[in-house]
C-alpha cells in the first residue's frame, strides 16, 4: 500500500473508534523519518487502547504489519510505526502538551473529518470532506 493511501486508511480506522481532531501531516519535504504522521485525540485511556488496537487490526487485515509500537503501558500516547506512516494516538491533554502539529509546523496539514460530523448535504451524497491547512475544502466521492 502506498504511504498516502496507508495514512488515509489509518485515519479512517481512528475515526471508526470515535477518535477526533484527526490530522495527516505530510512530512516528505521536511524529513526522511517518515512520509506521514496521522494524529488523533481521544477522551480516555480505554479509548486510546481501542483506537490503537483497531488501527493495528485493520492494518493487519490489509497485510500491513506494525514495525514498532510504543505506549501501551501508560495509555496516554501510543505510537504505531508503519515505517512510511507513523500513527500517534493521544489522550487529549497529552496531545496539547506535546503539540506535534506545532513541532512539525512546516508540514502540509490535512484535517480528516467524520462523515457524521459533516454538513447534511455532503453526508447525503456519501462524500467525505478533508480540509488542508490552507482551509481549502476537498470533496471526494
Q: Which stretches of residues belong to each language-model region?
A:
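Short hydrophobic/aromatic beta-strand micro-patches
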Residues: 39-41
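Surface-exposed, low-hydrophobicity interaction/linker segments
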Residues: 1-21
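Compact, glycine-rich, soluble single-domain proteins
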Residues: 47-61, 79
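RNA pseudouridine synthases
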Residues: 78, 88-90, 95-108, 120
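Glycine/charge-rich, flexible interdomain linkers and switch-proximal surface loops
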Residues: 22-33, 65-84
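Intrinsically disordered, low-complexity charged/polar segments
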Residues: 114-141
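Conserved, well-folded catalytic cores of nucleic-acid-processing
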Residues: 13, 17, 58-62, 92-93, ...
